[in-house]
Amino acid sequence: MHVHEAALRWTQVWTTGWARQDAEAIVELQAEDGVHWSTPFDSPHRGRAGLRKYLQDAFASEVEPTRARFAAPLVQGEQAAAEYWALCRYDSGPLTISGCTMLRFDTRGLVVESWDYSYVIPGHVPFPFDW
């Protein structure tokens, strides 16, 4: 699978998967031995089981579905970057997340490495872009 196609599929599945809290749809995008860093300061989530646990924990803390939008991914070689904007709500209140995920894909179009970088602020800031 071409990396641009894989990256576009990744953004589409994350958009709907996050809103539906569909961990399995997102997990299927990752290679069996893929590694995901949700933050550069903690240990990575290893394999599909690690990503699944991370997503289930994250979704369990949401009190309503997250609304997320992703920009068209930027692709070079086997890597891609996808910027996103998400409006979340937790027991502590609403949050806006502005972030970017760096991705590396294998030849099957599955994610072998991903790194999230994000900035979080209290409240909901409307989507500033027309993605």
How should each PLM-predicted stretch be described?
Residues 14, 26-27, 34, 47, ...:
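Hydrophobic pocket/interface hotspot
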Residues 33-35, 94:
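Short hydrophobic/aromatic segments of transmembrane alpha-helices and their interfaces
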